[in-house]
């Protein structure tokens, strides 16, 4: 698969989707995108900047949701054009697909909406690359059907169906907790789509703080290393210069100053994993 100007797949180095959870301000977006571009360029990591114009599934109705679609898309367009990086954002409603697809390089669908057929089809029919997050309630093999819905819609819209990615972000484990079953990364290859691992939402504690979600960011490196050792096409990690002050998902965000060291270790591990191939394919 080729997207955003680079090749994506297990035969290539992992690419990175990263940025603050939500667009808090124009200044934060530009500062974070610029810093991430510097880091990833030095390490040779293909990079897509991510931030949301609206967080439609916050725990509390009083929580900060974002700057809205108009201002948010303007900031993302300016980041893309002025910083010089591809941009990704999530859409939450079918009506948002067309205006968002006109601006961003890749769409992302929230995990909660992975079974909403009309929504998934609309995203895929835009013919933009679409990163479909697996629901916390879904078995990894069920993503085969989700991906097929999207692929069919893309083909019907005149594409070849190769614009779909699938993303693991953990599975519900009782109340207010998630676990990551690393087998799912291999199982989700059965979709025929590149597999992305979301290392920050996987350490989220949904609703764990009552009016907001908690998180255990200290386990982001642990799960990211495990995913890279399994073999993934891409990594998703939210980051913030000061997670304690982040307006959304701060408890599971990677401090921006720690991204270089984390990514350096992951690049080395990715090289080893992909150089040696995937012996599990011979076990079937």
From Swiss-Prot:
Recorded catalytic activity of this chain's protein: D-arabinose 5-phosphate + phosphoenolpyruvate + H2O = 3-deoxy-alpha-D-manno-2-octulosonate-8-phosphate + phosphate
Gene3D superfamilies: Aldolase class I
Residue ranges the record marks as coiled coil: none
EC numbers: 2.5.1.55
Keyword Transferase set for record: yes
GO CC terms, sorted: cytoplasm
Major localization class: cytoplasm
Record key words, sorted: Cytoplasm, Lipopolysaccharide biosynthesis, Transferase
One Gene Ontology biological process: keto-3-deoxy-D-manno-octulosonic acid biosynthetic process
Subcellular location: Cytoplasm
Gene Ontology MF terms: 3-deoxy-8-phosphooctulonate synthase activity
Pathway: Carbohydrate biosynthesis; 3-deoxy-D-manno-octulosonate biosynthesis; 3-deoxy-D-manno-octulosonate from D-ribulose 5-phosphate: step 2/3; Bacterial outer membrane biogenesis; lipopolysaccharide biosynthesis
Entry annotated with the keyword Cytoplasm: yes
Protein family (similarity comment): Belongs to the KdsA family.
The protein, known as: 2-dehydro-3-deoxyphosphooctonate aldolase
Species of origin: Bordetella petrii (strain ATCC BAA-461 / DSM 12804 / CCUG 43448)
Lineage: Bacteria, Pseudomonadati, Pseudomonadota, Betaproteobacteria, Burkholderiales
Gene from which this protein is expressed: kdsA
């Amino acid at each position: 698969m080729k997207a955003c100007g680079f090749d994506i797949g297990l035969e290539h180095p992992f690419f990175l989707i990263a940025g603050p959870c939500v667009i808090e301000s124009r200044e934060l977006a530009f500062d974070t995108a610029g810093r991430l571009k510097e880091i990833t360029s030095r390490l040779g990591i293909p990079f897509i900047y991510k931030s949301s114009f609206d967080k439609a599934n916050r725990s509390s109705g009083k929580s900060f949701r974002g700057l809205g679609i108009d201002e948010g898309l303007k900031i993302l367009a300016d980041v893309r054009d002025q910083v010089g990086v591809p941009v990704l954002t999530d859409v939450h409603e079918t009506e948002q697909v067309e205006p968002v697809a006109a601006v961003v390089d890749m769409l992302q669908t929230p995990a909660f909406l992975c079974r909403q057929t009309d929504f998934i089809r609309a995203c895929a029919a835009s013919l933009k690359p679409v990163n479909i997050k697996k629901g916390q309630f879904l078995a990894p093999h069920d993503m085969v059907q989700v991906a097929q819905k999207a692929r069919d819609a893309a083909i019907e819209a005149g594409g070849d169906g190769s614009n779909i990615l699938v993303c693991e972000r953990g599975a519900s484990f009782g109340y207010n907790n998630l676990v990551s079953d690393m087998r799912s990364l291999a199982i989700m290859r059965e979709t025929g789509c590149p597999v992305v691992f979301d290392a920050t939402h996987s350490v989220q504690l949904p609703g764990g703080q009552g009016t907001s979600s908690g998180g255990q960011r200290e386990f982001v490196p642990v799960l990211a290393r495990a995913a890279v050792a399994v073999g993934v096409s891409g990594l998703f990690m939210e980051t913030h210069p000061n997670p304690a002050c982040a307006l959304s998902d701060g408890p599971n965000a990677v401090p921006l100053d720690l991204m270089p060291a984390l990514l350096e270790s992951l690049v080395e591990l990715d090289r080893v994993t992909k150089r040696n191939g995937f012996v599990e394919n011979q076990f079937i």
